[in-house]
Amino acid sequence: MQANELFDRPNTILLDGGMGTMLQAAGLKLGARPEELNITDPALIESIHARYAAAGSRIINANTFGASAHKLADSEYTLEKIIAAGIANCKRACAPYGALAALDVGPLGELLEPNGTLAFEDAVAEYGRIVRAGVAAGADLVFLETFTDLYELKAALLAVKENSSLPVLASMSFEAGGRTFTGCTVESFAATARGLGADAVGINCSLGPKEIFPMAKRLTEALPGSFPVFVKPNAGLPRADGSGYDITPQLYAMQMKPYRELGLFAAGGCCGTTPEFIQLLNGVFADCRPGRPDHPMKSVVCSPMDCVDVDGITVVGERINPTGKKRFQQALREGDMNYVLEQAVSQTEAGAQILDVNVGAPGVDEPALMEQVVKALQSVVSLPLQLDSSHAEALERGLRVYNGKPIVNSVNGEAEKLNTILPLCKKYGAAVVGLAIDERGILPKAEDRVAIARRIRDAALAAGIPQEDIYIDCLTLTASAQQEDVLATVQALHACKEELGVRTILGVSNISFGLPCRSYLNTTFLTMAMYAGLDLAIMNPSSEEMMAAVYAYNVLTNRDRQSTKYIERYANRVPASAALVQAMQNAQTAPAAGETPEAAGPYAPLMKAVEKGLKGEAAARTRALLEEKEPLELVDEALIPALDIVGAKYEKGTLFLPQLLQAATAAQGAFEEIKTAIAQKGEGSASKGRIVIATVKGDVHDIGKNIVRVILENYGFEVIDLGRDVPVETVVNTVREKDVHLVGLSALMTTTLKSMEETIRALHDAKLDCKIMVGGAVLTPEYAKKIGADWYAKDAKQSADIAKEFFGV
């Protein structure tokens, strides 16, 4: 099979299974790097590939999953040499069977900013080096797998596209709740990966076939019927005794049968699967054809955690725009991100579903500022963004660092703009707004605007932008200056919807500029536009009249099924007159000085800043409170309760890892102010307890452990982080020398569970007065108990809960 035939096969292709599983069975030594075996034991690696090929695999992943500069930093072999050897071994094994050799690429093992310290462009560069090495070695395709961070997957996809012309398959790993470790949804993955040019997308690792199936079904529903989809589930879950996985090859094949209905392009296995598993898949997929019946594609934009389906009127918050706002312009010139973030948070709370982002102001570097603002916004809010600029460089800077699928606002009918901006939208997978204007300006007649819109639509389709990603703005003119043209906008909008089959968008509030009681005009015009077919309304979400019109319209047009969203928003609302009476009563019964109920206490603004991840705001609020309150009082009465609130929401699944980490970052900003205040008073900083944490010997994965450290430190604990691949004796000696009474151990791989057990045994044998908590993807509560741990912590928040319980704080 040739790479150019990959997506024209009449039947579902079989992928391979677990390389790590096979190496472990072959006696891989603890701490050994599997990728170095490409050079030190090529016969072993080639034989494993050959067994998979003989079992029916026609895409074989080279033994390069962990081959990155980050993970091979202290290897005696270069990245290029390891990849070259890995591809060569794979191609030799593939040749007799006509199989393809894939450059297997996994995560770098380090969190990207803002959740970690790895810069996005550094990640792109590191992946670019990997891809170039694979191309030079003769890889037939690139297989990106086991990603949990959509931002890192974007970096990898850009690197593949910018450094090769090879086909690329992209896969993420999802947890049982339907999101990745960092909170990414299946739908956000589908929209983003497809937009960035992945040739096929899939789900691998984490769970078994039965658990992955509902997510795989959602993946197919989020993509065109012809778009290739694949799966590589685990052989179930790890056994509690660490002896392998709990699904046999026969049961695996049985649980894979429902996938026949999904029209998979390819199927294989991941952790715990062997050639015997793949052999049985031949019978499951022998007569299966890839692809599914076509279905109408939804118009979506997304961040990792929030995929917005533009079904019904969707509200785009307009407030991140400096036009006519002196305070906003000043904030942009001064680089005051706190002001921008406050606008984003307030619009989110008011009900915006997408945020328009415009940073064009006199005296600013718009491209640099667009990049800075996009990074800042996506570190705090989860809403998708609409990048609002006519400046191509500013758009590209924002598009490149955006995590998800955004909207570009905008392009117009001028040939130069079309030729410049549409390719950017295509490269970065963005939806696009087309303004019904060209070199002649805004034309008064509706039919002329529709003609421009048709030209924009046709150009976008020719550039490879799907129909569902094209939005037309027929341009709102002010009623005060061009009253006679107001209806033309509505008529043009309706015609675009009916004749061109595109989505529509309007900046609604422009209609009332220069007139009194603007909300009356805005709401009425919004209602007219909605009836004409408006999809996206750029407006102020703090306008209760306009928001009420949106929610009511979606009910009355049967878009809000069972009035669910309307009831959720308005069930507990009271009429304005009743609200006024209640406010007067509240004023008469205001809490006395010293009383601090949650809604009225002096700590509420600080707690909110922490909860929302606003580091600058949290620091400013802390400085103000320190003028009246004792430093440690702020810790106990505001910061810890705020972190507890965030932690509770994290456990309930109403917020996710990025928000948890940003809340911790905001709390850290407050803690720095508190430490300064304590130092100025000549007092020592009081630790709530000392904890040693480490990733055990042989395991080089430390993302989870690093997250635990951040959370523990923000709860006021002193953390001694020993790093990764930590020898048993180092843990024991540190606990003894530092007089530590709580230890946290982490392991991600089944091969290092024995090392964790040995570390726990050594701590017990040394008769040290300490308790031990353990965590990691391969651990279970039962196995933790079996190896002598005192607690199993499923995540960073639970680690903090254990520490609080242990130290009695």
Please state what every model-predicted region is.
Residues 1-473, 477-809:
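Domain-level signal for soluble alpha/beta catalytic cores
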